């Protein structure tokens, strides 16, 4: 039963990767300021001036102070744009097994979802998708690359 769930999740992630990779745009450069990434290189940038991603410590899904502030800004924007739905993509760095990182990415995306819901954003407007370590923003194998890859990204779904 557990193997079926893992295989189902792996299949869903693969399909999602294929669908989203067909929609990919060219990446723009960004930089880290504390634990906030200031780039806008997602499929669709959430909103001008509002960061689209939050970052996590190694093996953690606990939101930092900076991450909570970013999500608060996202919630404000989402309240003003009540017809918008979003996908929260959970990611992990390359270390650890594929299964572990898929679960960790899901916990990270759910942490962001739970926080947005405390600001009145309906769960009906938020989908969660974990990519684990399958979609790194930085393919390096070093602490800086890993810190960029431990993230949850908010993507506009409609």
Predicted regions and their residues:
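Pyridoxal 5′-phosphate
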Residues: 16
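C-terminal motif of bacterial Sec signal peptides marking the signal peptidase cleavage site
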Residues: 19-22
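Periplasmic peptidoglycan-binding/tethering modules of Gram-negative envelope proteins
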Residues: 24-85
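Short beta-alpha junctions and helix-cap segments that line functional grooves
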Residues: 139-142
């Amino acid at each position: 039963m557990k193997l079926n769930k893992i295989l189902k999740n792996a299949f869903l992630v693969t399909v999602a990767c294929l669908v989203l990779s067909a929609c990919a745009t060219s990446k723009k450069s960004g930089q880290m300021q504390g634990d906030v990434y200031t780039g806008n290189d997602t499929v669709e940038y959430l909103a001008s001036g509002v960061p689209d991603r939050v970052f996590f410590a190694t093996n953690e899904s606990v939101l930092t102070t900076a991450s909570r502030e970013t999500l608060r800004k996202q919630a404000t924007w989402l309240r003003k744009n009540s017809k918008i739905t979003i996908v929260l993509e959970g990611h992990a760095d390359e270390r650890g097994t594929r299964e572990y990182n898929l679960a960790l990415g899901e916990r990270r995306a759910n942490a962001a979802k739970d926080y947005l819901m405390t600001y009145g954003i309906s769960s009906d407007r938020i989908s969660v998708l974990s990519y684990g370590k399958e979609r790194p923003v930085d393919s390096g194998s070093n602490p800086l690359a890993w810190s960029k890859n431990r993230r949850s990204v908010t993507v506009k779904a409609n």
